[in-house]
Amino acid sequence: MTGPGSAASALRRWTDVATVGLFIVILLGFLDTFTFSALGCGREWPLCNGGVTPGPSTQAQVEYWHRAITGVAGILAVVVVVWAWRRYRHPLEVRLFGAIALVFVGVQATLGAIAVFAPESAPIMALHFGFALLAFAGLGLMDIVLRQLERPETGWEFRQRGLSPGLQRYIWAVLLYALALIYWGTYVAHRGAGEACQGWPLCNGLLWPGFHGLEALIFLHRLGALALGILLGALPWVARRDRDARPDLWRGTLVVLVLVALQIGSGAYLILSHLAVNAEMLHVSLVTALWLGLSYLAVQTLPPSQPRPQSGRSGAS
C-alpha cells in the first residue's frame, strides 16, 4: 500500500507532467503560426481535411499534432486539478490556481477552435496565446503550491513574514504590465510586423524611426520591452530591504532579472536571424518562463490562506 506521502508525490509528479504539457502546447501554437500551418487541416475542427488523420503535407502534420497534443495536455490538466481538489480541501491556493487553470484551458481551447475559422484575426490569435499563458501559470502555480505543501520551508512559511507594501505593489504592477506587453508582442507577430524594423537595436538604421504603419507596431514593442527591462532591473533595489527576511523573493527577483535579460537578447536574435523558427521558439520559451516567474513572485507577496499547511492529505475527506 502507498502512504499519504507517496500519493502526494505522485500527484505532484503528474502535475509536473501536465505543466510541461501546457508549455509544449504554447510552443506548438507558435510553431503552427510561423510555419503557416494554421490552415493545414483546412477550416475544419475537430476533423483535419475531412478525416481523423492528417494528410502528407508538413502544414497538415504540424496543425494535426498541435491539436492532438493540446487535447491530451488539456485532459491531463483537468485530471490533475480534479485530483488535487479531491485530495486537498485546503489550502485555498490549490483550489484557486486549479480553477484558473481549468477556466483558461477551456477558454483557450475555445479560442483555438474559433481561430481555425479566423486565422487572420491578430486580436483573436493574441488572446489565444494570452489565455494559454494564464492556463499555464495557473497550473504552474498549483504545482508550486503542491511542492510547498510537502516542504513548507520552500516558500510557504516565508509568506507569513510579510514584506514592504511598496515591493508588493511594484511586483503586481510589473506583472500586469508584462501581461499587456506579451499580448502586444503576440499581436505584432500575428500582424506580420516582425521584420518591419530591420536591424537591432536600431530600427531601419534609425534610433527613432517614428510611428508609421507596421513599423510603429514593432517599434512600440521594442520600447515596451526596454521599459520592462528597466523595471525588472530596478527590482533588486526595490527588494533590498526585504532581502534577509524574504530570501524567496530575493532569489526569485534574481531569476526573473536573468530571464528578462535573456528575453531581450532572444528578441535581438529573432530580428537578426530574420525571424528564424528556432529563434522564435527560444523567444516564446523565455517569455513563458518569465511569465511564470513573475506570477510566482506576485503570489509570494500575498499572505498564505492558512498559517502552516500539513504535508500529506490536507483537509481532505
Please identify what each model-predicted range represents.
Residues 1-317:
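Polytopic transmembrane helical bundles with strong interfacial aromatic enrichment
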